[in-house]
Amino acid sequence: MNYYRKRLSPLPPNQPIDYKDTELLRKFITERGKILPRRITGLTAKQQRDLTTAVKRSRLVALLPFVNKEI
């Protein structure tokens, strides 16, 4: 009999996701610069929305690249 394990979020529930924290944001984007989906990151829905907003804001102020051209 299989029992489903509760998936734990990789971030604490109270931890804010800041657009200036590029080390944290880089954990959730691919080598090409795409944002990883929620099923891979394991974040909650609210954390994923906040992460997406933070990554997009970080790209606009040039802390993260839009596309990583290194192949």
Swiss-Prot record:
Pfam (any one): Ribosomal_S18
Protein name per UniProt: Small ribosomal subunit protein bS18
Top-level taxonomic group: Bacteria
UniProtKB keywords: Ribonucleoprotein, Ribosomal protein, RNA-binding, rRNA-binding
Keyword Cell division: no
Subunit text: Part of the 30S ribosomal subunit. Forms a tight heterodimer with protein bS6.
Keyword rRNA-binding: yes
GO CC annotations, alphabetized: cytosolic small ribosomal subunit
Family annotation (PANTHER family): 30S RIBOSOMAL PROTEIN S18, SMALL RIBOSOMAL SUBUNIT PROTEIN BS18M
